[in-house]
Amino acid sequence: MPGGVTVKDVNQQEFVKAFAAFLKKSGKLKLPEWVDLVKTAPHKELAPYDPDWFYLRAASTARHLYMRGGVGVGAMCKIYGGRKRRGTKPAKFRVCSRGVSRTVLQSLEGIKMVEKDAAGGRRLTSQGQRDLDRIAGQVATAMRKAQ
């Protein structure tokens, strides 16, 4: 970690892209069979266009757990929820697919990055926090070189 850079110190979009690339390159994250067929939420009309959307969702979830531990499946569904357009009726908020959120958290548990919290929800392990900080350091050095 150059200079003690943490996830909170870097641009979140650049970090999520870099961490998703790390997850894909490592090959440890187990992808479900239905990853190319599923819609991510009831308020979406189509499935994601990006074939690596599962890695991006896992990276975003890991970053959120870094910022606030003790978050469960229900809270993750609220975070990734959105506005459902219902035609002439007023729009309403809809949570995302619980199956997708649960599968992402279970996949992160499978690579020992997340563990269940005794108080409820899930939190990062020390290994997971170390990986996130290491990637944040790499993003920070890349951003410094780009300037």
From Swiss-Prot:
GO BP field: ribosomal small subunit assembly; translation
Superkingdom classification of source: Eukaryota
Swiss-Prot/TrEMBL keywords: Ribonucleoprotein, Ribosomal protein
Molecular function terms from GO: RNA binding; structural constituent of ribosome
Family matches, as SMART domains: Ribosomal_S19e
Presence of keyword Ribosomal protein: yes
Extent of the signal sequence: none
Gene Ontology CC terms: cytosolic small ribosomal subunit
The UniProt record lists the keyword Ribosomal protein: yes
Matches recorded under SUPFAM superfamilies: Winged helix' DNA-binding domain
Pfam families according to UniProt: Ribosomal_S19e
Family, per entry: Belongs to the eukaryotic ribosomal protein eS19 family.
Protein name: Small ribosomal subunit protein eS19
Species this protein is from: Branchiostoma belcheri
Annotated gene: RPS19
